[in-house]
Amino acid sequence: MRTNYQQESFVEGCFNRIFKGLSFKGIGLELARVKEIVEVERIENYKLPLLLFLLEDDTLLHIEIMNDEIKPDFQSMSVYDMSIVLKYGMQVRTVILNFGSKQNSNFQRSFGSVYYNTQIVDLSGLDGERVYEELSQKIGSGCLLDGRDKLKLVFLPFMKNSLPFNEVLPKVMSLIEKIKDEEERMAYVAVISEIISRSTGDQGVKVLKECLMDTEVGIRIRDEGKKEGMRDSLLIILLHKFDSLPDYINHAIMNQQNESILMDWLIKA
């Protein structure tokens, strides 16, 4: 398990900028504040946790999201949670943020003598269009976003909306472009991009790629990623979400060759 006592990657830095010190009390979770984002080692054949935070009380918070299109992988969730408990002896609390139809308050499953319980936080009452208007007014007036506003902005693409996802996401990205602080803008785009790439299928990644290519902050994210090396860039993280990569692209990534090879392939993909 990795925390920031090692050199944090570009994406980890963006997550920490948005979430560090954040409280989840605004959505009904009585937990300690976020200390930092945590990355765990990948377990073959199982989907990585969407979000894993180290809290100030030295417990871990594992967050997944669901709506009417996105369903959590409960098997992968339980495998990673139990692996962390057994390997590191840390307490893990797992929460699913539900933006779809109203769901039960928890998910329970037993594995022999092990009892696995996941809390579902029902956020189905959040209207994405209303939330968009509220955030648009705050951002437009230059107001600082509080903790609850930050959570709303990060998860805005997944809320109920009369528009399809491929129309909602560009609106969210355009809203973020209005944030005055450049580093803040970049952090939000990076965080939302990573969440989308981890939680949606190829269609979501395709929409995301189009949004990133067309925005100033998306280009900045790509350039910042290049400074760290190709394997740490957001662009590479997104590319790993494709079903497969040509052998010469895999070779270019592993050997950190000229990024133009990768960019040419991405443009044609």
Tell where the protein language model's regions lie, with residue ranges:
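Short capping loops/turns at secondary-structure boundaries
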Residues: 114, 158-165
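Alpha-helical solenoid repeat scaffolds
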Residues: 153-157
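Short, charged alpha-helical interaction segments and adjacent helix-coil junctions
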Residues: 3, 54-68, 162-269
